[in-house]
Amino acid sequence: MARTTPIERYRNIGISAHIDAGKTTTSERILFYTGVSHKIGEVHDGAATMDWMEQEQERGITITSAATTAFWSGMSQQYPQHRINVIDTPGHVDFTIEVERSMRVLDGAVMVYCAVGGVQPQSETVWRQANKYKVPRIAFVNKMDRTGANFLRVVEQIKTRLGGNSVPLQLPIGAEENFTGVVDLIKMKAINWNEADQGMTFTYEDVPANMLAECEEWRNNLVEAAAEASEELMEKFFAGEELTEEEIKTALRQRVLSGEVIPVCCGSAFKNKGVQAMLDAVIDYLPAPTDIPAIEGINEDGTPGERHASDDEPFSSLAFKIATDPFVGNLTFFRVYSGVINSGDTVYNSVKQKRERFGRIVQMHANKRDEIKEVRAGDIAAAIGLKDVGTGDTLCAQEAPIILERMEFPEPVISVAVEPKTKADQEKMGLALGRLAQEDPSFRVHTDEESGETIISGMGELHLDIIVDRMKREFKVEANIGKPQVSYRETIRTRVNDVEGKHAKQSGGRGQYGHVVIDLYPLDPEGPGYEFVNEIKGGVIPGEYIPAVDKGIQEQLKSGPLAGYPVVDLGVRLHFGSYHDVDSSELAFKLAASLAFKAAFAKANPVLLEPIMKVEVETPPDYVGDVIGDLSRRRAMVNGQEANEFVVKINAEVPLSEMFGYATDLRSQTQGRASYSMEPLKYAEAPTSVAAAVIEARKK
């Protein structure tokens, strides 16, 4: 079957933003204008197409990033038809994993900002993730119709807070309730959308006289940014010659693709203004799969490999999300980087080294799906019923195996014990948690060996609430959850040398004998977390027992001597020991190593580390004193505040253990007018009194 849309006309984009910037509404409008959905879904009615899990519609926030395909030929039908694959990503920090994962498979992103709130804390996290994966982006300043809307302030914040070179493509005509349309700075025309048909049609008009001077100035700024793409254009610009519309767009595109410029559009998705022009900007400035460098990977023999975005290369794709669908079971979302695959074909999972058969392939439109027969380079689709595929696995042609880069997933910071309400649900709960952990790598499940309880861990209270909620809805398992537990860590502060561990049982028959001498030393928290250095000379311990020593120590790291928390940031140097020809074994050396480690750890000034969160509170000025007072009681280190007339932003670092229930307390202190966000920042040494209490509690 021939390709219906040439790959140069594909745009794989993510829409990402802070929680209330109106991102899902923007996605809904995209589906409406591109003709996919015939009735606009409103988030505040709980009818949005992209938010299809029940909890999302109740809470009005986006949890799983739905992938949708849409087609667009421009506001004035000025382009051949382009295919836009939109991935709607969550804006809540507890779901950062979803954002990280979708950034990995996107080619470009639209960053949505609220014209009132501007660049908010989560925007910074998302921006850093986009930088990490070198994703070219444009910005859309939404909610221009809201009281306090200020377009140019947001343009400035993108520069100062995010370090992005923001260049407006448009200026708003009016603001707040007087917002009527935008001026297209390249064409120097005002665009007015028709309210009667929900903005489906529009007219170009002259720029309002009172805005001419300002528009000229910003147009000059835009043309200069474009001209910097090449010497030739710079000369033309400085000679005072006009650049054509075509030259401006081509040059800007070049600078967006290299990450040098962020074009900024504005509008009000809710009022049906501006989204159409933003879609044009997606086509004008964001990359096709062929505009970005070939994806890199590792060939079967360990050498570096790559795949170009072409149908002629061997098939390669990355599974970036596993979702459970009530009707068809497992859905594996994947992005095709190269080649072609048909439903019914067998592919190779190079990470798990297993074959998988692509039974049915579907293209998702939010939660509606169309079955398709084949997918090609650049496509995003979902496969039904793959047996053993995890997030981040590579699915590729059997005859040309490659492992595309794995994604890195954050370590959970909070844990709670969960138990089913009835004994009968025990097995169902295990099954449900296993399924949910497969979907979400930032969520972990394990059984506490001492208490036998099931412990679930995740990225925050909201994350775990939603997991428990999904168990109830999707798997019909009612569960009780315990008090949240913080994931502490243990480490050492000083170096100790020449600590020995000896395991010897030699009373008749085959004995056991292992003897090691180690040094233990602290490592930089930014480093690898653990290192093992073998400096045995002259065969005092035979080579085959060295891995057993390393293993013996690594097993101790899982549950530290202080309070049973994971041990981090230390190194071990094995430099002496002895063995017995008959009685030595791997097990004996493993036990000797663990004895040496425990003895050394106790002498090396062990400390407890607690997770510190980066907290940002936004509050009306009247409550600043109360908020800071309360943060101080929570052992916060307040790093500063920024204020404008409506809101004060307070930045602080606070131990996670002090943040439980903060949402409720903050609400009551500020009559519900303040909001906050937090994300894991680092681990730091817990004060002696706190550490003592934690260690004591673990002994009970």
Curated annotation (Swiss-Prot):
NCBIfam families: EF-G, PRK12740.1-5, small_GTP. One of its GO terms (molecular function) is GTPase activity. InterPro entries: EFG_II, EFG_III, EFG_III/V, EFG_IV, EFG_V, EFG_V-like, EFTu-like_2, G_TR_CS. It holds the Pfam family EFG_C. It comes from the Bacteria. Residues 8-290 form the tr-type G domain. One of its GO terms (biological process) is ribosome disassembly. Gene3D superfamilies: 3.30.230.10, 3.30.70.240, Elongation Factor G (Translational Gtpase), domain 3, P-loop containing nucleotide triphosphate hydrolases, Translation factors. This is Elongation factor G. The gene is fusA. It comes from Glaesserella parasuis serovar 5 (strain SH0165) (Haemophilus parasuis). It is found in: Cytoplasm.
